[in-house]
Amino acid sequence: MKLSAKLICYHLQKSFSMHTSRLDTSPTLSCPSCFEKNTVLQDGRVYLITDADFQLTFHHPKNILFLMIGKIYQNYELTQPNMCIIPEDIPVNIVFNRIQDIFILYDQWNQSLMDSRLRNASIQELLDLTASIIPNPMMLIGMDFTIIASRDWNLSDLSNSVLGSTENSWAIVDSLKQDPHYEEAFYK
């Protein structure tokens, strides 16, 4: 499964202090590699760099994330997109393993979603499977504001699981009705 530079750095920031340049949001990266001098850079890679003599050229493939590790990069200027600095002297294998864990997490999630669809699992199960990736509460509602599935929402104050059935949920229904996507979908 391919991931974006922004998503990888989002997860890395949970484990390491880091600085980043502008990061791409398109999922183009597929695996990490340790950078070695005089090797041809390959598209779609996350390169871990610890070499003090590393010089970024403008003639490299576009879909690469450069992850520079060590105090020697503390003042390195982030001049190009998809550059990230971990300004600590951390063993490369620890960062490499963390990146591998991120790819494994998303691969397992993707596989579980595919398996659930093959089993014809419910929408509720799909929401539950997504909890490891998107921890926020989620709710899927129909055009008539009936709650089809939800995760981590307290629905006890809604009669018949319908948004708008109580005064507490009127504001939610009003804001949903103001959304241009609702009107577009409703009148198709």
Which residues make up each language-model segment?
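Alpha-helical/coil-rich non-catalytic "connector" segments in signaling and regulatory proteins
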Residues: M1-K188
